[in-house]
Amino acid sequence: MFRVQRLRMFSTSRALYAGQNMTEKIVQRHAVGLPEGKTVVSGDYVSIKPAHCMSHDNSWPVALKFMGLGASTIKNPRQVVNTLDHDVQNKSEKNLTKYKNIENFAKKHGIDFYPAGRGIGHQIMIEEGYAFPLTMTVASDSHSNTYGGIGALGTPIVRTDAAAIWATGQTWWQIPPVAQVELKGELPAGISGKDIIVALCGVFNQDQVLNHAIEFTGDSLDKIPIDYRLTIANMTTEWGALSGLFPVDNVLLDFYRNRLTKVGNNHPRINEARINELQAKSDSLQADPDAKYAKKLIIDLSTLTHYVSGPNSVKISSTVDDLSKQDIKVNKAYLVSCTNSRLSDLESAANVVCPSGDINQVHKVAEGVEFYIAAASSEVEAEARATGAWQKLLNAGCLPLPAGCGPCIGLGTGLLEEGQVGISATNRNFKGRMGSKDALAYLASPSVVAASAILGKIGSPAEVLGTKDPNFTGVVATVEDAPATSADGKDVADESGASGSVEILEGFPSEISGELVLCDADNINTDGIYPGKYTYQDDVPKETMAKVCMENYDPDFQTKANPGDILISGFNFGTGSSREQAATAILAKGIKLVVSGSFGNIFFRNSINNALLTLEIPALINMLRDRYKDAPKELTRRTGWFLKWDVSQAKVYVTEGSVNGPIVLEQKVGELGKNLQEIIVKGGLESWVKSQL
């Protein structure tokens, strides 16, 4: 049972409250080419030079793109990290050749390289100090959010971005709206970080944090260990966020002091001097008391119990007690992945299978159930062997796999087969991700996964241990939204970081305008924009791309939309695959700007990387929907409203009848700096990189 209370925050202009949140402060440190005195804020487009950039099995495709750009040297080899972690069980000649190519490339260019078996890239980034508090660290992987668990701003990038960083040391980022998530109350005994994030995904399941950066706060933080924080940050990806940032506090500083005892003081990135420096500057890089947030979500941890996500969706969360009553039989269980395969996770599962502590007295995995385990890294596995946790799990009948991603990504041994049910401590349970699309996948904490493997059905550790879970009456949670515009459509958004006037690069327009053409639907995917049957045809001419643009969404789009129009659509526009043609087909149609309530993140990055401009204006799509709520349904509609984006003032004006007609909406948007303008003028990120070589 969930009880969510919705409140409205008192809206004020940031001209009065000028503080930065933690996300903005970290971006400020890594932004390059800012105008003098510029303070970055949510919405701004900035060029960034991240501290580190990790790629894994996709390092070879990135390398091919890098070489295809004409690049021959890595700008800063110390910035780049290559790991092999996804398909480590695959010993085919093709995969081994790819792995060897990555290793040889790394050696040639002096890149830090970690071979198959060393562990999952995200875990290595934390163990080896590449991801470090108060820095920005990116990776060509969607679970880069994980780094937020140790106070680093981690966010995913696409392969073109990675190649750009390899070649030039930098790429671009638009600072997202930032949501504050307050964790209050004391977490009941036995309830874990996985239960927290699964509950958050289930309680706030209406895209409240889609494409937001998240900052965690609250009086509960001093009792939430780093392993829990890493799990929570990791699954902010599934929650829809672009980052999930925890503060630097005594819990984190103690974590690094303990880490120092393991790596020694001569480690290049984790050493006493760096930890002391972190402690000294941590206060100045915490969120200011008057920091601005797009919204605030509050959850009372004292009201949580064991939660299970699914089947086949992270937006569906149930208590383990409710599912236990349904007697859902389990065929496979998994304790693997960057989400929950650290030492504390393995020990949590071991405590369920071996509550007495006697390694020879264990609860056995139920007959007919396969329980797979893999440590997050070789270091974690060694520690688990030393503590006895690994042997307890093996004695219970668990099946070990090498440190790596494996079943989580649907690779290697132990995948779900047709009709089977799996329960996993991983992060995604999308249909077909862990095997057959006709299987059911649930997500849960390590202790619940272990208990379910023993019981042969989804169940609680209390059922195995003969104990009783705390009384549960429902999660208490609250949402506080800050309006982006006032009732009359006037902007009340943040202007404290505005420089007053954005300098315009020669060749870039100071204004962009056109009639709004409405494609009134949410979740228009990349196949709707550019049909999949053309995706792998490399010789499709521009004229054909223009003709098939939006074909699968609405065949009439071709006759209703004209070159020079501005396309506007609903929320999560461009969800789906990573095909770049979804952006280039819109450009081929002669449309230079797309406006939506929100974008799929990969489409958003592919758009800018290919010189297609985008703006998120939720208020505008809501106004248009209200305008046409009683009109006959049209998939594509010419609105008679015109949008003018004054790039120099970072404002948009929506008018009726013509560009000079009466204003129906005026709103501040993020500043598009000269560095980003240059990418557009050059024709996209790849062309910009070539110009820098």
From Swiss-Prot:
Cofactors demanded by this protein: [4Fe-4S] cluster
Species for this entry: Kluyveromyces lactis (strain ATCC 8585 / CBS 2359 / DSM 70799 / NBRC 1267 / NRRL Y-1140 / WM37)
Keywords: Amino-acid biosynthesis, Iron, Iron-sulfur, Lyase, Lysine biosynthesis, Metal-binding, Mitochondrion, Transit peptide
Name by which UniProt lists this protein: Homoaconitase, mitochondrial
Lineage: Eukaryota, Fungi, Dikarya, Ascomycota, Saccharomycotina
First and last residues of the transit peptide: 1-17
Residues that, per the record, bind [4Fe-4S] cluster: C338, C405, C408
This protein's pathway: Amino-acid biosynthesis; L-lysine biosynthesis via AAA pathway; L-alpha-aminoadipate from 2-oxoglutarate: step 3/5
Pfam families from the UniProt entry: Aconitase (PF00330), Aconitase_C (PF00694)
Listed GO CC annotations: mitochondrion
Family statement: Belongs to the aconitase/IPM isomerase family.
